[in-house]
Amino acid sequence: MHVSTLLVAVLLPLALSKPTPRKKTSSFKVHLARRGETEYYRDGPTDLQRAYAKYGIPTTHEMEGYHPQPISKLPGNSKATAGSGKEGVESQDEKGEVVNNPTDHDIQFLSPVTIGGQPFIMNFDTGSSDTWVMNTQMTDEEAKKDHHLYDPSKSKTASKLVDQNFDIKYGDKTHASGPVYSDVMDIGGATVRNQAIGLPSKVAASLAEDKTSDGLVGLAMTKLNTIRPVKQKTFFENLAEDLDEPVFTAQLRHGKMGSYEFGAIDKSKYHGDLIKVPVINENGFWEIPCSLYSVGKLDKIQTIQNGTGTAILDTGTTLLVLDEKIVKAYYAQVPGARYDPTRFAGWVYPCNSPMPSLFLAVGTDHMAIIPSSLLTFQSYGPGPDGVETCYGGLQSNNAGGIQILGDVFFKALFVVFDQRGPSISLAPHA
């Protein structure tokens, strides 16, 4: 098979609410400052367990015995803060942009959001369609600690949506549920006046323990929205008709500041040409064909055999979660790699082992390279044998029938989400 090297750096082609009317003449870049003097992180097995829960993937017997680690304090300097929302504001034009901040190990890319004039740091999630925020009406006082809390009584623009409730479940254990309010929501200068926002009266402990984030902005399709009895549009869907282009882009880079941008595609943020891929949106996800892979070399392209054939682009998931066939083929090329069913309930390897790159199909005509440098999630230090152990950024979907292109994928590629079609487009980061 002849393979062009036109985009060899990362992409390789193979043979219901109303948004605020806005002028399309200005935008704002919002730089993050610090969020206090504490910093938090998750561990790899916990993130994998949460990914399984989010998509209802059955856990392994070993994972059922693995207890998610509480969010732990670490020394360091990659901290996020919710300030006034105006710090470091830089006026530009014809687009709305918000700069995100990676937390430890790039587990989340967090961004400043203003709701009813109140500032928060939130996680943008292209794998769900509900927007919800920690708030003063939560019944669990412990869950409120160390979060910025939305108070509808302090907003002049808030109104409760009568008899409307949301209940988003990420598997059996992780959830958020409660009443729904409408309020003005601003992200990087892009504003929706009557955005539906869930105010959970209770949240799962794993969500409350994540002190880096005050909530979630869902950016998948309305079909996934859990508000009842009437589904509500996402922030992006409300905003799209007032944008120059109905798009938003994700620039999530390893260990660096990145950005989400609404209404325009900044050509300075990527190399080469964008590769456009139609989205399979029947399930409400940003889902694309993904049925080919190769480990290390493009001359050994293999077809995924178990019939999954698609993958979901999800900024709310940390890891790359793929069919077990791919994962086993990858780690077969990593000296000392093994599936550890006890301590890690996932794939680990000596940190000094050479790692191959991973090639994945994006659509039917192109392959994306995930560089080896992005495929280590974190180190756990020396094991009993004195060898430093690393947890892989690539993990198995446990035959769950769903493949998830999480932040490991986004760190390799600049991604455009386009409502027209819909479609996604990809290119190497600049």
Curated annotation (Swiss-Prot):
Enzyme Commission number(s) from the entry: 3.4.23.-
Gene3D superfamilies named in the record: Acid Proteases (2.40.70.10)
GO biological process: one example: proteolysis
Xref: InterPro entries: Aspartic_peptidase_A1, Aspartic_peptidase_AS, Aspergillopepsin-like_cat_dom, PEPTIDASE_A1, Peptidase_aspartic_dom_sf
Compositionally skewed regions (Basic and acidic residues) per UniProt: 87-104
GO molecular function, one term: aspartic-type endopeptidase activity
GO cellular component: extracellular region
Domain Peptidase A1 span(s) in chain numbering: 109-427
Xref: CDD domains: Aspergillopepsin_like (cd06097)
Cell compartment(s), UniProt: Secreted
Signal peptide range: 1-17
Alphabetically ordered keywords of this record: Aspartyl protease, Glycoprotein, Hydrolase, Protease, Secreted, Signal, Virulence, Zymogen
Region called Disordered, residue ranges: 61-104
Cystine connections: none
Kinase keyword on record: no
Role: Probable secreted aspartic-type endopeptidase which contributes to virulence.
Family the entry assigns: Belongs to the peptidase A1 family.
Protein name per UniProt: Probable aspartic-type endopeptidase TRV_06366
